[in-house]
């Protein structure tokens, strides 16, 4: 047995010990920011099913990334509306509750330090006097004066 035919230690099952290729993560392959490997590990560790397909963690990571981007965009808009540069839990709550679909998805979720949506029942608001204001003149000088007696 020649020493040249044996594989070198630490070659990872590859023939020879040439330059190693740079590893490409599944997140990069899928074009995602969220970690596909970590999501896959959580799926396996959580025992949601006996087996987990190769596409499942990629799909779930993509869905999570989309939801996070959607919430962050709306929360950023809420922060900008309030003239703030930093997103707070209040901005997250306003973003989620003002969006119909996200509000339905996160209906049972409590956001800590989020507060409540501003809401005043219309019955409690002061009544507008548009009809009365339109029928009476605005200033007494412009009202019809009674004719002067001679």
Curated annotation (Swiss-Prot):
Cite the domain annotation text: Contains 2 SPKK motifs which may interact with the minor groove of A/T-rich DNA sites. Phosphorylation of this motif may regulate DNA binding. This motif is reiterated in both termini of histone H1 and in the N-terminus of sea urchin histones H2B, but its presence in the C-terminus seems to be unique to plant H2A.
Q: Which domain of life is it from?
A: Eukaryota
- Localization per Swiss-Prot or TrEMBL: Nucleus; Chromosome
InterPro entries the record matches: Histone-fold, Histone_H2A, Histone_H2A/H2B/H3, Histone_H2A_C, Histone_H2A_CS
Q: List the CDD domains hit by this protein, alphabetically.
A: HFD_H2A (cd00074)
Tissue specificity field: High expression in root meristematic tissues, moderate in whole shoot and very low in mature leaves.
Record note on quaternary structure: The nucleosome is a histone octamer containing two molecules each of H2A, H2B, H3 and H4 assembled in one H3-H4 heterotetramer and two H2A-H2B heterodimers. The octamer wraps approximately 147 bp of DNA.
Q: Which Gene3D superfamilies match?
A: Histone, subunit A (1.10.20.10)
Gene Ontology molecular function: DNA binding; protein heterodimerization activity; structural constituent of chromatin
In terms of one coarse class, where is the protein primarily found? nucleus
Biased composition, class Basic residues, residue ranges: 1-24, 141-150
Motif SPKK motif 1 positions after renumbering to this chain? 139-142
Q: By what name is this protein known?
A: Histone H2A.1
Q: Which family does it belong to?
A: Belongs to the histone H2A family.
Q: Does the keyword Acetylation apply?
A: yes
Give UniProt keywords alphabetically: Acetylation, Chromosome, DNA-binding, Nucleosome core, Nucleus
SUPFAM superfamilies in alphabetical order = Histone-fold
GO cellular-component term (any):
nucleus
Q: Where is this region: Disordered?
A: 1-26, 128-150
Positions carrying N-acetylmethionine are: 1
Q: Please give the Pfam families that the UniProt record associates with this protein.
A: Histone, Histone_H2A_C
Q: Which PANTHER family match?
A: HISTONE H2A
Q: What is this protein's function? A: Core component of nucleosome. Nucleosomes wrap and compact DNA into chromatin, limiting DNA accessibility to the cellular machineries which require DNA as a template. Histones thereby play a central role in transcription regulation, DNA repair, DNA replication and chromosomal stability. DNA accessibility is regulated via a complex set of post-translational modifications of histones, also called histone code, and nucleosome remodeling.
> What broad taxonomic lineage does this protein's source fall under?
Eukaryota, Viridiplantae, Streptophyta, Embryophyta, Tracheophyta
Q: Where is this motif: SPKK motif 2?
A: 146-149
């Amino acid at each position: 047995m020649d020493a040249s035919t044996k594989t070198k230690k630490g070659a990872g099952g590859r023939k020879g010990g040439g330059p190693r290729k740079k590893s490409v993560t599944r997140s990069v392959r899928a074009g995602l920011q969220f970690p596909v490997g970590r999501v896959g590990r959580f799926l396996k560790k959580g025992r949601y099913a006996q087996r987990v397909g190769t596409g499942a963690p990629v799909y779930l990571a993509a869905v999570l990334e989309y939801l996070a981007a959607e919430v962050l965009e709306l929360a950023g808009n809420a922060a900008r509306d309030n003239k703030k540069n930093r997103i707070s839990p209040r901005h997250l709550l306003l973003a989620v509750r003002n969006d119909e679909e996200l509000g339905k998805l996160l209906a049972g979720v409590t956001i800590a330090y989020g507060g409540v949506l501003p809401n005043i029942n219309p019955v409690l608001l002061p009544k507008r006097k548009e009809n009365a204001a339109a029928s009476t003149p605005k200033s007494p000088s412009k009202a019809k004066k009674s004719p002067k007696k001679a």
